[in-house]
């Protein structure tokens, strides 16, 4: 919750700053009729950082073999197609199907001797097909830029999930293929001579429990496993 409050404060400051500077400096507008289009398209490229929220089972502390359990994020990249429907002067509906490549690690600390632990790190690769819908709320346009906030939900399908794969004796952490996430973000639209360029950052929180329990120590120790992360994207429309 504290992180969300920080983002909201930053968004408000950006919008206030854009209003003040926009009123002082007026320049010839690029693409003056751009925002009157009912429908337009584009593409997006970016980087991401995926991680897990790990909720341990209630009997985790009673386990005298597994002593530590935590997740670690890694950087990935994403690319997608932008479809934007104008709803009003300040609001748009956006559909941005994307292909997201990322990976995460879950680290298990097992008791090795009385005074030391042995780390077992499980690497989890994900190739996600995202289907997000956003409502975008824009500030007034000033010169050749405007700020915006957006929020929505997305369905993700992990084509790299090992949920239905026979591990043949190998102990792997299996995740379910389907996920549902909430997302919020903000960005700035820059109107260039021939197109609009938009840097944007979003944070997401998974709603579903992804752990696929196969009665191994690696999954039995986890009660709930959900996704969280952020994306920094650059959109060309």
Where are these regions (language model features)?
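Residues on the lipid-exposed face of transmembrane beta-strands in outer-membrane beta-barrel proteins
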Residues: 43-47, 79-85, 97-99, 131-137, ...
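A glycine-rich, hydrophobic loop/mini-helix early in the fold
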Residues: 80, 85-120
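Flexible, solvent-exposed loop segments that connect beta-strands
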Residues: 55-70, 103-126, 159-175, 211-223
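Short glycine/proline- and aromatic-enriched beta-strand/turn motifs that initiate or cap beta-hairpins
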Residues: 22-75, 237
